[in-house]
A protein has these predicted regions:
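Short alpha-helix
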Residues: 182-197
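Short, glycine-/aromatic-enriched active-site segment of Class I SAM-dependent methyltransferases
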Residues: 160-180
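A short SAM/SAH-binding and catalytic strip from SAM-dependent methyltransferases
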Residues: 125-137
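Conserved alpha-helix/loop element of class I SAM-dependent methyltransferases that forms part
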Residues: 37-55
């Protein structure tokens, strides 16, 4: 599975900002370009506050990408974070950036499928941003999340859910774009958490908010086309443009919705 092309493009962006390969990098600067979810560190600060992540927290992140969320959480709170990412190239770059940011004493990167990840203990928090719907076998991974949490531990997730039906002639393209291996309806989403022993404390429905974000992101990306292609080439631009435009369309046409959810192990 490769949602985004050329994970090395983040290193190109750092060079364009005058930061050489292997040079130290500040989290505050890195966080402006290493976030793969919606609304960047503002979304992470909401999670930190509402899920009450602090210096004594032990956090497991599922689907860590470049490690941007893990670094921000560790930097802002002092928490220890285990960052699990299935894509080897993203994990490799993520762990390198974590070391360059001086956070490798707080963050452990693991290149693994979450379903195969061996739990070595329990966590106060499990967090995930726009990753859970990619993982197959939803009952199994929700059960594993519950197993990973200590008693009264907290799950915080931003995720997609299925909304209006996707036309049959568009289903193949939709699947290729999203890898929606466990995309379920909102009712099914809540029921699955309950069945896994995770009781919902609060939810926030996000489709209008994220729909606006994805549309604005596409427009801004296209406005910067010349500069982006100069750094990364036209093939990378075209691949990202198709993805960004497709996501904006999926929200606008009601094929997907989005939510924030806070749940606690019962």
């Amino acid at each position: 599975m490769e949602l985004y092309p050329r994970p090395e493009r983040l290193l190109v962006e750092l060079r364009a900002r005058g930061i050489a390969d292997n040079a130290p990098v500040l989290v505050e600067m890195l966080s402006k370009i290493d976030q793969l979810h919606y609304h960047g560190t503002a979304a992470l600060d909401i999670a930190i506050e509402r899920a009450e992540i602090g210096s004594a927290s032990r956090v497991l992140e599922i689907g860590s990408g470049w490690g941007g969320c893990a670094r921000w959480i560790a930097h802002r709170t002092g928490a220890s974070v285990t960052a699990v990412e299935v894509q080897a190239d993203y994990d490799r770059i993520g762990r390198s950036l974590t070391a360059r940011a001086g956070l490798d004493d707080r963050i452990m990167h693991v290149n693994a499928d979450f379903l195969d990840f061996q739990l070595a203990g329990t966590y106060t928090h499990v967090v995930s941003w726009l990753a859970l719907f990619h993982i197959p076998d939803r009952p199994r991974y929700l059960g594993k999340i519950a197993d990973a949490l200590e008693p009264t531990g907290v799950l915080w997730a931003e995720d997609l859910y299925a909304s209006d039906p996707v036309p049959n002639n568009e289903r193949a393209a939709f699947n290729a774009r999203l890898f929606p291996n466990s995309l379920v309806t909102l009712d099914e989403y809540s029921a699955g958490l309950h069945q896994a022993g995770l009781e919902i404390v609060g939810t926030e429905d996000m489709p209008q908010y994220w729909g606006h974000f994805t549309a604005t992101r596409t427009a801004a990306f296209r406005a910067d086309r010349a500069a982006f292609e100069h750094r990364h080439g036209s093939a990378t631009f075209e691949a990202l443009d198709r993805f960004y435009d497709g996501m904006a369309s999926d929200f606008a046409r009601g094929f997907v919705g989005g939510l924030r959810v806070l749940a606690r192990k019962g």
